[in-house]
């Protein structure tokens, strides 16, 4: 892999096995990326998607991590990085005729939200 030095400037929150498909979550994450903390919460509150609630909980958790662990002010925070990855599929079976069963794959995803301070970025 080489020598990769990762410097974590902000705080992050990770949501695992969120029961939403990646494409549905991606349209929400693309909307809040590079927004301020308050603006992201307002956008998530008024967007008409079911997947907004887990993302808003992650933004609140990342802000709490930033204020408690790093001592950053919540008014200076913004969403610096946000991404979605595939996770496991929940496998279920639908009963069909003559004793058969058809598999159903219910997708899940991993969501990562990273908040940074505006004063650190400048």
Curated annotation (Swiss-Prot):
Signal peptide start-end: none
This protein's record includes keyword Nucleotide-binding: no
Keyword terms of this UniProt record: Chloroplast, Plastid, Ribonucleoprotein, Ribosomal protein, RNA-binding, rRNA-binding
GO cellular component: chloroplast; large ribosomal subunit
Pfam families documented for this protein: Ribosomal_L22
Compartments it resides in: Plastid, Chloroplast
Molecular functions per Gene Ontology: rRNA binding; structural constituent of ribosome
Record GO biological process: translation
Oligomeric and partner information: Part of the 50S ribosomal subunit.
Described function: This protein binds specifically to 23S rRNA. The globular domain of the protein is located near the polypeptide exit tunnel on the outside of the subunit, while an extended beta-hairpin is found that lines the wall of the exit tunnel in the center of the 70S ribosome.
Family from the record: Belongs to the universal ribosomal protein uL22 family.
Protein name as annotated: Large ribosomal subunit protein uL22c
Annotated organism of origin: Adiantum capillus-veneris
Gene name, Swiss-Prot/TrEMBL: rpl22
